[in-house]
Amino acid sequence: MVKNIIWDWNGTLLDDTRINYEIANIMLEERGLKTIPEYEQYREMFGFPVIDWYITMGYSFETETYEQVADEYVTLYGRMLPGCNLKDGAKEVTCELRDRGYRQIILSATGQDTLEENIRKFGMTGMFEELLGQENDLAFGKSERGRQYMQRCGMNPAETVLVGDTDHDYEVAQLIGAGCILIDSGNQSRTVLEKCGVPIIHSLRELLVIFGEHVK
C-alpha cells in the first residue's frame, strides 16, 4: 500500500524542459560547439551525471571547470524561468493526493535555496512535508539525500513511490528501495524511459487513478 510519494521537481512538476534545451544550445553556441538541432533529440541525449552529459555534448573542461559551467547554466536558468509554468495538473494532483492523506516530499538535484525559491514562486508552499534539495547546484547527491531523509523519518520504502522524469530518478528509487513511476513529458523521451521497465504516464492526472482514494 503506497502511503508516501516522493516527487522530482524539474521536468516532473515544473515544465522547464524546453528552457533546458534552449540553454544547452545557447551555451554550446557560445563555445563554438555543435548545437542540438531538435528538441526531441535533446530528450534522447539528456542524462545523468550531468557532467557526463556535458562531455557528450563536446565540453572538454580543459579551459573551464564544471563548477563554472554549472554557474552559467544556473544564471541563464534564472533569467528564463519566468517563462515556465507548472506541468498541467501539478497543483490539482498534489492537492488531491494531500487531501487523500498521502505524505508528499520533493527530492531534487537542484540546490536547496533555488528549490525553495521556485516552490514559493509557483505557489506550492505548504503542499509538501519536506523539500529536499542539494547543498549546491551541481546536481550531485540526490539518492543519498533521499536515503538519509527516509531513515531519519522512518519512511518505509515498501510504502513509497518516487515520481520522476528520467532514468536517474529510477536509479534513485532503486537505491532508496522505493517504487517508481516515470512521466514521459519531461527531460527524457519515452523511448529512454521504457528501458527502466517501470510504469510510464503521460499526464500527472493519471496518478489520481493509480493511487488509491484514501491512504489506509
Task: Give residue spans per PLM region.
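Conserved Lys-Pro-Asp/Glu-containing loop-to-beta segment of HAD-superfamily phosphomonoesterases
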Residues: 4, 142-171
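N-terminal helical cap/lid subdomain that shapes the substrate entry/recognition surface
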Residues: 2-88, 92
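Short, acidic loop-to-helix structural element flanking the phosphoryl-transfer center
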Residues: 78-106, 116, 143
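Acidic, Mg2+-coordinating phosphoryl-transfer loop and its flanking beta/alpha structural elements
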Residues: 161-200
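A short, structured active-site edge motif that brings together acidic residues
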Residues: 42, 124-140
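Glycine-rich phosphate-binding loop signature in dinucleotide/nucleotide-binding domains
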Residues: 100-102, 153-159, 214-215
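Conserved phosphate-coupling serine/threonine residues in phosphotransfer and NTP-handling enzymes
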Residues: 12, 108-110
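Conserved H-loop
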Residues: 34, 124-129, 156, 201
